[in-house]
Amino acid sequence: MEFAAFADRAEELAAEPADIGTTRLVTDLLGAAGGTDENDDDLATVTRFLLGRVFPAHDTRTLDVGPALCREAIARAAGPNVTADDVEDRLAEEGEIGAVAAGFEFGGQRGLAAFGEGRDRLTVAAVDAELRRLAAAAGDGSESHKRDALFGLFNRCEPAEAKVIARLVLGEMRLGVGEGAVRDAIAEAFLAGNPEGDERDESDTDDDPILRAGDEAVVAVERALQVTNDYGRVAVLARDEGLNGLRAEGLAVGRPVQAMLAQAGTATDAVEAFGEVAVETKFDGARVQVHYVPESAAEGDDAAGGTELGPRIYSRNMDDVTDALPEVVEYVEARVSVPVILDGEVVAVDDDGDPLPFQEVLRRFRRKHDVDRMREEVGLRLHAFDCLHADGEDLLDEPFRARHDRLAEVLSDAAASVEFAGDPAAIEAAEAAALGAGHEGVMLKNPEAAYTPGNRGRDWLKRKPDVETLDAVVVGAEWGEGRRAELFGTFLLGVRAGDDELATIGKVATGLTDEELADLTERLEPHVVSEDGTEIEIRPEVVLEVGYEEIQTSPTYSSGYALRFPRFVGVRDDKSVDDADSLERVVRLAGDEK
């Protein structure tokens, strides 16, 4: 597929206001990208590009291209009379990098036009290959290599293509295409009238894409997405193997999946919903997923691919944090003798084994050097509480009670303990014991519930804390004053308000030490989009936990709400922008306070 064709469809999608219209456009695009077997790579790539990704969500590779590098590449491709400062000035006017890139005539266009010749057309496959080479650049000179590679792409671009590439490399596609729309489009494009992967028959299809594909097809696509975390792979599976292929797809050890999440609730809520309640300690730690294939067991497990895999530890964001957590690796190696995928929490502990604050855990997660020294200062302990795969068997569809029993088997009875209670008083007693031991409280789970990756449902409840906090995204900043003049001093916060959208909810400047301000400034500077005086626009990448006294309605911020007396609690390194709190939760919390 020519990249210009993809760019044109992207422009249509960005202008499409209706959800059903979006699904139809995505369906048509996937059909065009995956119409023949020769287009396998294009189908997978186009599906990922639609969601602003070059790699599957579980893949730890990144492009590692910041706004400044992108501006420099655009300036170079635009010609000798254009500087990075010129690009930044245009960015201040346009407000987003795609429009800026589309506004320049790049070198390749000018040269070919002078000779009256056409140019070698970019293809989707060529762009994907170049971006993958760019991601592979590492070590000395890697920044220069990335700049050269990006310049080469821009130099071959027409305006619409440049807009998409600039947005793609910075993770700012802004097409208004959510994961749900892509899921539904995969079902419609390849499963409507084609449930088993045979020749399609479109003679008796309805106009509604969801009805045409059918709930069964959408469920099968969703399930395959849960176990693969790869929209490109699932699109190809749906086209080539139909429902049977999607249903046959399982977990793979070494390929992390999204964590199942909890909603807030009370003991009474849990008893009324579940009857008997599984009560677990809620640890003040960082969520992890453990993948391990012992050498002795590799060949007998299809999910292991027949190869040994030393323990790999993945964060909630599916980042590989194995090297920072050697004691977790040792813990797993000492106890597990079969291939497993475990869900759990890593907690910081002192010399006596008592829990330390959450921020101590994050000090270890971020550590790439001097790990042994940090290990002496802050110890870690794994509390595994769920088992998704064991010894060749996927357990997602098994009830929690059975999964926990399997967990106890594979961990030699070292699994996190669970109690079963049938009344609120027993739950409150368990919570008091957990709090007395220095933990965060309790989790309340439906003993009969399956494990649904990425789902925040009512089968897992976390007891409401006495003081609420919000996980909000940094979308802007202001320079400090006085001795803090060279540091960001105030941070503009946003919450999720829809697909690819964030709504501002307030600014936080209280509760930060000089050291924390310096750390945040260092983290955020590579993501600066533009500056206007003391105000700075920042690409959303960093999530902060903030406390507050109350939530008020306010016309000042785009959410319609403002945090009263916000205070910094900590950086949530374990959370991505997609894990930040939603405007829906803000509205609910504001209502609860009235």
Curated annotation (Swiss-Prot):
Transmembrane helix listed as a keyword: no
Family: Belongs to the ATP-dependent DNA ligase family.
Keywords, ordered alphabetically: ATP-binding, Cell cycle, Cell division, DNA damage, DNA recombination, DNA repair, DNA replication, Ligase, Magnesium, Metal-binding, Nucleotide-binding
Binding positions for ATP per the UniProt entry: E280, R287, R316, E345, F385, R456, K462
SUPFAM superfamilies: ATP-dependent DNA ligase DNA-binding domain, DNA ligase/mRNA capping enzyme, catalytic domain, Nucleic acid-binding proteins
GO BP: cell division; DNA biosynthetic process; DNA recombination; DNA repair; lagging strand elongation
Cofactor(s) this protein cannot do without: Mg(2+)
GO molecular function, a single term: ATP binding
Designated name of the protein: DNA ligase
A Pfam family it matches: DNA_ligase_A_N
Functional description taken from the UniProt entry: DNA ligase that seals nicks in double-stranded DNA during DNA replication, DNA recombination and DNA repair.
Record-annotated active site: K282
Reactions this protein catalyses: ATP + (deoxyribonucleotide)n-3'-hydroxyl + 5'-phospho-(deoxyribonucleotide)m = (deoxyribonucleotide)n+m + AMP + diphosphate
Keyword hit for Ligase: yes
EC number in record: 6.5.1.1
